[in-house]
Each structure stands twice: as structure tokens, then as C-alpha cells.
């Protein structure tokens, strides 16, 4: 099973994934956790470039770097893990690119979606289920403000992050069978309980 966790800045994806992984391992599943950009040596190298506020990367170059990292990530890590029977949980995937670069970033939802869905062939490589940790932009940014160092996307203005939230919710509305929206203001364990019910329904 391939699970993706999406959400805006400060939604608590890292804590959610850690807690969800722990519960699934307790149920006897083999879990592989990963992230984007990252998840493989190429992805980790690209991550440093993409998140560095000092790097002046054009929007189209940024998009292509995300896609190159994802293509390698899918082939090198995700597909082999799934073929071996493991459950893969990824912190971000296609929809983050569609929202951050396509919708909020202005490159166009349809254009970016088409590129994402053909990054490893003619057919879209999609997760079995996507959990969207939904949080108001202001609340998420307040959480992030406690950190000492903010990456390029975390430093963007609140209007950008409001567009990110609206973009994710719009995608969730278009794909209700795949998307499950969780309230990121709830305690992490409460969200994990809800997620486990959805995962068990797919088994």
C-alpha cells in the first residue's frame, strides 16, 4: 500500500507520519517512510537546492528539479518497497507540486498535473490513499515561526499559504475516493485513529 501525507506548512505531517508508522508496525506491517523532495541520494541533493532561500531558481527550473527528484525517488525507492510487500508512507508527493508550483506558484494546475502524472511513464503513478492534514494558513505559520530557520517556502507570505490550503482542499474535493481530509488542529493521535479506520477499509 502506498500512503501519502499532504498539507501546508505547520500541519504536523512529520509527527503524524511517525505516529501512524508506529501504529501500523504494531499491527504487523513493514513500513518504509520517505519524503519529497528527498527519499534517495539524488532527491536529497536536489532538496538542498530547492529549499535554500539563497538559491534564485526560476519557477520552471524549480518544477523540473522537483520532477527529476520524484522520478528517481519512485524508481529507486517507492516501487521496490511496494513490490516487496511493504507499506510506503511519503511526506508529500504529486499533489504538493500541483499545489505549490501549479496553483499557488502560478504555473497552472493542468500544466503541472500533466507533467506530474507522466513523470515515470504514460500512466499516473498515484497513492492508494492521501491524507490531507488541513490547517488554516495563519495557524500553520505561527507553528513554524517557533523554528530558528525557515526554508524558502516557509518564508513565503501568508497569501501564498492561503492559496496552498485552498488548492489542497480543491484537489481533495475532486478526488474524494483517494483523499481523506483530517483536522490538523486535533491531537495527532486522534488524527491517526481516523486514518487507521480509512486504511483498514482499503485492506
Swiss-Prot record:
- Keywords annotated in UniProt: ATP-binding, Kinase, Nucleotide biosynthesis, Nucleotide-binding, Transferase
- Kindly list the GO CC terms recorded for this protein: cytoplasm; cytosol
Record-listed ATP binding positions:
7-14
Record EC number = 2.7.4.9
Instruction: Write down the PROSITE patterns for this protein, in alphabetical order.
Output: THYMIDYLATE_KINASE
Q: Which reaction does it catalyse?
A: dTMP + ATP = dTDP + ADP
GO BP annotations listed: dTDP biosynthetic process; dTTP biosynthetic process; dUDP biosynthetic process
A GO molecular function annotation here is: dTMP kinase activity
For the keyword NAD, the answer is: no
Family matches, as PANTHER family: THYMIDYLATE KINASE, UMP-CMP KINASE 2, MITOCHONDRIAL
In the record, the note on similarity to other proteins reads:
Belongs to the thymidylate kinase family.
Q: Which NCBIfam families match?
A: DTMP_kinase
The task this protein performs is described as: Phosphorylation of dTMP to form dTDP in both de novo and salvage pathways of dTTP synthesis.
What's the protein called, per UniProt? Thymidylate kinase
Gene source species: Chlamydia trachomatis serovar D (strain ATCC VR-885 / DSM 19411 / UW-3/Cx)
Q: Which gene encodes it?
A: tmk
Amino acid at each position: 500500500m502506498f500512503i501519502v501525507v499532504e498539507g501546508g506548512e505547520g500541519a504536523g505531517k512529520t509527527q503524524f507520519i511517525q505516529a501512524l508508522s508506529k501504529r501500523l508496525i504494531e499491527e504487523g506491517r513493514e513500513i518504509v517512510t520517505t519524503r519529497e523532495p528527498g527519499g534517495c541520494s539524488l532527491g536529497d541533493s536536489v532538496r538542498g537546492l530547492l529549499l535554500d532561500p539563497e538559491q534564485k531558481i526560476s519557477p520552471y527550473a524549480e518544477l523540473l528539479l522537483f520532477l527529476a527528484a520524484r522520478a528517481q525517488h519512485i524508481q529507486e525507492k517507492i516501487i521496490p518497497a511496494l513490490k516487496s510487500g511493504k507499506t510506503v508512507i511519503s511526506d508529500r508527493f504529486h499533489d504538493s507540486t500541483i499545489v505549490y508550483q501549479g496553483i499557488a506558484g502560478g504555473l497552472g494546475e493542468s500544466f503541472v498535473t500533466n507533467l506530474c502524472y507522466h513523470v515515470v511513464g504514460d500512466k499516473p503513478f498515484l497513492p492508494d490513499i492521501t491524507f490531507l492534514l488541513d490547517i488554516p494558513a495563519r495557524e500553520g505559520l505561527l507553528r513554524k515561526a517557533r523554528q530558528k530557520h525557515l526554508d524558502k517556502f516557509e518564508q513565503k507570505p501568508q497569501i501564498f499559504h492561503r492559496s496552498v490550503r485552498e488548492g489542497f482542499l480543491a484537489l481533495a474535493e475532486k478526488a474524494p475516493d483517494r483523499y481523506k481530509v483530517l483536522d490538523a488542529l486535533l491531537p495527532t493521535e486522534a488524527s491517526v485513529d481516523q486514518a487507521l479506520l480509512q486504511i483498514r477499509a482499503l485492506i
